[in-house]
Curated annotation (Swiss-Prot):
NCBIfam families: msrA. It comes from the Bacteria. Its EC number is 1.8.4.11. This is Peptide methionine sulfoxide reductase MsrA. GO terms for molecular function: L-methionine:thioredoxin-disulfide S-oxidoreductase activity; peptide-methionine (S)-S-oxide reductase activity.
Length: 174
């Protein structure tokens, strides 16, 4: 099993897709990359803690290759916008990848190179060593499954799920 910590805007979006990905055993929404110990959602959303909203995706690389997890990441958000994903604006929504080993860092850099071929603007995804990971509050875990009819889910997450189904259907469970 392997775990990647990835930030691509609001963690609810990545969580929704990776929850439906074959070989993924766990998706934990959380915060990392900031300077406040044990931040909460409201502190992170204030933009003053330095944290990014992220998901820790644990998967079996014999079922779903690392490259698929990473390529999906770049397909599900715009890695060319600094500190913004759609209407979500602030450093907490930055495109980011947090590694724990040199091998992960290399994988992340290779994924950025692959993704750059798909984007006309430069990719601004931050690649950093993983500092402390703070698990988000329970309400944010598997958010889409809990609140599929909530406005944000309908307007923002549903199109991302549709895109994932279009391009990664072989890797999705439903």
């Amino acid at each position: 099993m392997k775990t990647f910590v990835l930030g691509g805007g609001c963690f609810w979006c990545l969580d929704a897709v990776y929850q439906k990905t074959r070989g993924v055993s766990s998706v934990v929404s959380g915060y990392t990359g900031g300077h406040v110990r044990n931040p909460d959602y409201y502190e992170v959303c204030s933009g003053t803690t330095g944290h990014a909203e992220v998901v820790a995706v644990t998967f079996d690389e014999t079922v779903v290759p690392e490259e698929v997890i990473l390529d999906m990441f770049f397909a599900l958000h715009d890695p060319t916008t600094l500190n913004r994903q759609g209407y979500d604006v602030g450093t907490q929504y930055r495109s980011s990848m947090f590694y724990t080993t040199t091998e992960e860092k290399v994988l992340f850099e290779e994924a950025i190179e692959r993704a750059q071929a798909l984007w006309s603007d430069p990719i601004v995804t931050e690649v950093s060593r993983l500092p402390e990971f703070h698990e988000a509050e329970e309400v944010h875990q598997n958010y889409y499954a809990k609140f599929p009819y909530q406005g944000y889910c309908q307007v923002i997450i549903n199109p991302k799920l549709a895109k994932a189904r279009k391009y990664y259907s072989a890797w999705l469970t439903a």
